[in-house]
């Protein structure tokens, strides 16, 4: 079993901390962190909890996901394993990942499945550990990342691949964008009962300054327009907004992303 904790950073980032938790309930003596954009946030957590840093996982090269790597290496030593996509030439990555497959986090007793997700950036990857997905800026709750380097088709395929994961897969996104994403989702699919219910729950959480994450793949398939581009209501909304017929899910997805970029 995996124990996960989101650490808030900057305005809306989450640095995810995880460690194995044995059947007895005793946790491992150290943690991994995902996308430490701010090293001090991680250091403060380690001091507070008395944990050791076992390693770092990086999903893509953007500075708000990588900015803390060098500080953490200076503090805890160059032996710290830092995994990340080889193609993105990220300073501090000493275990470059070149393809889909498994990596063994032996010091934590865990295996991670690497999933290539081009779109937000060309080299973007996600890590699936047990039933927990660390997906960076590809999939958000009720939304998806902007397409900075890849194509709409690449992003569509990446999200489609994530949509094939089991419904109970926990989704650990890197940003607390949920409320803003839900405003758009309700605009394009206003009669989605699951979306209406989820919006109320998310608003209640944020009113208490609590994270809306992790979500789940099943939840996102029910409420996220970017995983629902074949929805009849979404296609009708797009047809009205763009004054054109919607012929296929990729076209629908591309127009959704275009609309959201200017929403």
UniProtKB/Swiss-Prot annotation:
Organism in which the protein naturally occurs: Shewanella pealeana (strain ATCC 700345 / ANG-SQ1)
GO BP terms: methylglyoxal catabolic process to D-lactate via S-lactoyl-glutathione
Enzyme Commission code: 3.1.2.6
Quaternary structure, from the entry: Monomer.
Cofactor, free-text remark: Binds 2 Zn(2+) ions per subunit.
Keywords, comma-separated and alphabetical: Hydrolase, Metal-binding, Zinc
Family statement drawn from the similarity comment of this UniProt entry: Belongs to the metallo-beta-lactamase superfamily. Glyoxalase II family.
Cofactor(s) essential for the protein: Zn(2+)
Protein name, per record: Hydroxyacylglutathione hydrolase
Pathway entry: Secondary metabolite metabolism; methylglyoxal degradation; (R)-lactate from methylglyoxal: step 2/2
Protein origin, superkingdom: Bacteria
UniProt-listed InterPro entries: Clx_II_MBL, Glyoxalase_II_hydrolase, HAGH_C, Hydroxyacylglutathione_Hdrlase, Metallo-B-lactamas, RibonucZ/Hydroxyglut_hydro
Binding site for Zn(2+) 1: 60, 62, 120, 137
Major enzyme class: hydrolase
Recorded catalytic activity of this chain's protein: an S-(2-hydroxyacyl)glutathione + H2O = a 2-hydroxy carboxylate + glutathione + H(+)
Function: Thiolesterase that catalyzes the hydrolysis of S-D-lactoyl-glutathione to form glutathione and D-lactic acid.
GO MF annotation list: hydroxyacylglutathione hydrolase activity; metal ion binding
Residues engaged in binding Zn(2+) 2: 64-65, 137, 175
